[in-house]
Amino acid sequence: MNNYNKAPSQNTESTGWESVAAMADEFKGEKEKRIEIGNLSPEDNFEQVAEALFLVDQYIFPDLFGDEEGAKKYSKELFSDDPEALFSFDKTLVAKDENGDIAGILVYRGDKCTPWDTNSIREKYLAIGNDLPERFERANENYLKKITGPELPKDAVEIEFLGVRDGYRGRGIGSSLMQSLINNPAVSEVHLDVLDSHPGARKLYDKFGFLPEGDKFPNYPDGTEGVQHMVYKNPHYVDKKNEEVE
């Protein structure tokens, strides 16, 4: 996860979505109900997906969508069948409750990521009748294009967006989404960034076995806060290509 898409506002009561930091307290909540983890599909409730995307990040999605109504109208167009795209159905995990409602979402990218195409996104946006938000170009060029740029090690992934809806906190949902990803034997490493202002998130990542890598760098856009890159190396990783050769 790059330094432009760090965290939602920490005022979770006003956003309806917790910051990633709040996940450290998830196991203290109400009695667990049935939650299933799987990939996002075109049949899912994209108004709930839009709520997730619009509120999980305080920089990117208000710039991209303009407002929450824009997010509800447009979010489905953002997702792609291309398994190597950012916002791929293949690389978006959702947690659903017993009614099929989306409780949480985790968006990640792989080691090979299709370059972000601002023109394609612009055309899709205009085709469904939305005016371009004032900072649409900034969201695409300064945020999303840069997220898809850095290369990752073979079979590694990077978590870009993670959130749990209000009403589902305290049930370990964020942790379950994370566990589902790091337990995947096809994933060699999981990368993410954590803000200094989120010690709870850092504690959670430490618990999962993430280790800091490299020096801290400034947070976008004001540079007043440190960001630490962290990596989890999957001990259960199986390199299928090497397995086939043997």
In which residue ranges do the predicted regions lie?
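Conserved beta-strand in the GNAT
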Residues: 94, 101-110, 158, 163
